[in-house]
């Protein structure tokens, strides 16, 4: 099979300027910091659970019984764990609602302002939730719930904005590998959050929240002063003009002069007034775009599984194998390593095939087997890390593809070429649908684990992964059929 022209000529890197590199790094690390603050919460669940239970259940507390018992939130660690699962669900529901709103807002306001505001405001909320309440010894369930709802809404500004900015700077050529590598930002953020939390956890869980919130706030300031949301801001041509030029350069000029007028606008420089006339599409129009609904439903199932590992993996390792919380935090990094490798490699393969769905289908089928294998992992850290990496490769990889490269494809398809302000809205729909599924899943995970045990949690993951394949099965069949026809045409030409 012939490789795409961008790989044949080695022209992918030659398209990029230092502005592309800066945008790549700024958006990468901005979302990494947002994810690091989320990961902190999952990494300190055991410590929080101990702090919220009375001393009769918590022998590590040094305070007098009378003082501690007057401040505890829950009568047992099981009740505290269930509330932590509820907080995950609350966060994800508010995050999902916020994604739908943030996508629409991002297509209508300056993406840099929206992203910077979300990062700085979220950092303040995380600081109050984890550090300030502990320093003041003020424990209140309703306050925690309200803070986590607000945090979910503020964090939701991140993903639609960074994907839209990346979509403004990087065209369809090589998008799978570029976005596959870039989508590792979430996994890098998980690793960063795990490392930061484990490094200061010995001083108290509140310091884990303090460190990540401080770094995230500083990142928001950098974004406000340093991010360019589109090439047009510095007088460069947009990616639509580059893609049109690329397509035109491969068309045979057989019609003589009558094509010149048709193609001439592709080489002209648009003034500011023409750029300003582009309007954002409506939410309903974005939902009706081909592929948006199937991928949204599929991502609802897949993000449920991926985020269950994100929220519960350190707790599972500590609870199921009896490993120390700091050790479990560090070991959970291997799931994200697998996701980084999987997203990049699968994105590259999808670029070579010029199709996304068949690559997703194969990876998800193998994900079912990896879940079965990991559910039977022995109490050995090396074997567990290996199986965890494989599981992250086949689950985290497809999740990264859908949320980044595929969302960018959907937001820049031919039907909306004259309405380029759709990328943030489409990304918000896909990721918002995924977050709704993930929100429901986090409560179900805690409930299933409490009633039936961890093995049934893995059965639930297998079911959701299978549903992901079912929802995109029409796209899989269509794209495989297209590959077969293309292969047959290639054979006939030879």
Curated annotation (Swiss-Prot):
SUPFAM superfamilies: MFS general substrate transporter. Glycosylated. Interacts with ATRAID; the interaction is direct and both proteins are mutually dependent for their stability. Glycans are attached at residues 58, 266. Its main location: endoplasmic reticulum. One of its GO terms (cellular component) is lysosomal membrane. Belongs to the major facilitator superfamily. Organophosphate:Pi antiporter (OPA) (TC 2.A.1.4) family. Unlike the other SLC37 members, lacks glucose-6-phosphate antiporter activity. In osteoclasts, forms a transporter complex with ATRAID for nitrogen-containing-bisphophonates (N-BPs) required for releasing N-BP molecules that have trafficked to lysosomes through fluid-phase endocytosis into the cytosol. Pfam families: MFS_1. It comes from Homo sapiens. Expressed in liver, kidney, intestine and pancreas. It is a multi-pass membrane protein. Keywords: Endoplasmic reticulum, Glycoprotein, Lysosome, Membrane, Sugar transport, Transmembrane, Transmembrane helix, Transport. GO terms for biological process: xenobiotic transmembrane transport. This is Sugar phosphate exchanger 3. It is found in: Endoplasmic reticulum membrane; Lysosome membrane. GO terms for molecular function: xenobiotic transmembrane transporter activity. The chain crosses the membrane at residues 16-36, 81-101, 113-133, 147-167, 177-197, 209-229, 297-317, 333-353, 357-377, 386-406, 428-448, 452-472.
């Amino acid at each position: 099979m012939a490789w795409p022209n961008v790989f044949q000529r080695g022209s992918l890197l030659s398209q990029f300027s230092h502005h592309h590199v800066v945008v790549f790094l700024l958006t990468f690390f901005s979302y990494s910091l947002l994810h690091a603050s989320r990961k902190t919460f999952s990494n300190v669940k055991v410590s929080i659970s101990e702090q919220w239970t009375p001393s009769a259940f918590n022998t590590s507390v040094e305070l007098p019984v009378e003082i501690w018992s007057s401040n505890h939130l829950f009568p047992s660690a099981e009740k505290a764990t269930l509330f932590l699962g509820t907080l995950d669900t609350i966060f994800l529901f508010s995050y999902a609602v916020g994604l739908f709103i943030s996508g629409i807002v991002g297509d209508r306001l300056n993406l840099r302002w929206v992203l910077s505001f979300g990062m700085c405001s979220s950092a303040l909320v995380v600081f109050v939730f984890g550090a300030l309440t502990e320093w003041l010894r003020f424990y209140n369930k309703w306050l925690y719930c309200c803070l986590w709802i607000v945090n979910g809404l503020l964090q939701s500004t991140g993903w639609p904005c960074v994907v839209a900015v990346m979509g403004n700077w990087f065209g369809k050529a090589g998008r799978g590998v570029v976005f596959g590598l870039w989508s590792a930002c979430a996994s890098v953020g998980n690793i960063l959050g795990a490392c930061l939390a484990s490094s200061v956890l010995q001083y108290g869980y509140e310091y884990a929240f303090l460190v990540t919130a401080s770094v995230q706030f500083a990142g928001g300031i950098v974004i406000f002063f340093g991010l360019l949301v589109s090439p047009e801001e510095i007088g460069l041509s947009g990616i639509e003009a580059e893609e049109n030029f690329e397509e035109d350069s491969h068309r045979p000029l057989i019609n003589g002069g009558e094509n010149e007028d048709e193609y001439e606008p592709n080489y002209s420089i648009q003034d500011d007034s023409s750029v300003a006339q582009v309007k954002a599409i409506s939410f309903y129009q974005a939902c009706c775009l081909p592929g948006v609904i199937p991928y949204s439903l599929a991502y609802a199932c897949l993000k449920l599984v991926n985020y269950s590992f994100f929220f519960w993996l350190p707790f599972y390792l500590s609870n199921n194998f009896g490993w120390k919380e700091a050790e479990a935090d560090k070991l959970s990094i291997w799931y994200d390593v697998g996701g980084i490798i999987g997203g990049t490699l699968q994105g590259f393969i999808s670029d070579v095939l010029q199709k996304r769905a068949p690559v997703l289908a194969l990876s998800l089928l193998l994900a079912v087997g990896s879940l079965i294998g990991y559910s039977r992992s022995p109490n050995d850290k090396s074997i567990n890390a290996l199986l965890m990496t494989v599981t992250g490769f086949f689950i985290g990889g497809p999740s990264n593809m859908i949320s980044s490269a595929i969302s960018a494809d959907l937001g820049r398809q031919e039907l909306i070429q004259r309405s380029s302000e759709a990328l943030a809205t489409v990304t918000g729909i896909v990721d918002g649908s995924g977050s709704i599924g993930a929100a429901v899943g986090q409560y179900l995970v805690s409930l299933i684990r409490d009633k039936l045990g961890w093995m049934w949690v893995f059965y639930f993951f297998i079911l959701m992964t299978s549903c992901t394949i079912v929802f995109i099965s029409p796209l899989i069949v269509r794209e495989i059929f297209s590959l077969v026809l293309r292969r047959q045409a290639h054979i006939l030409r030879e």
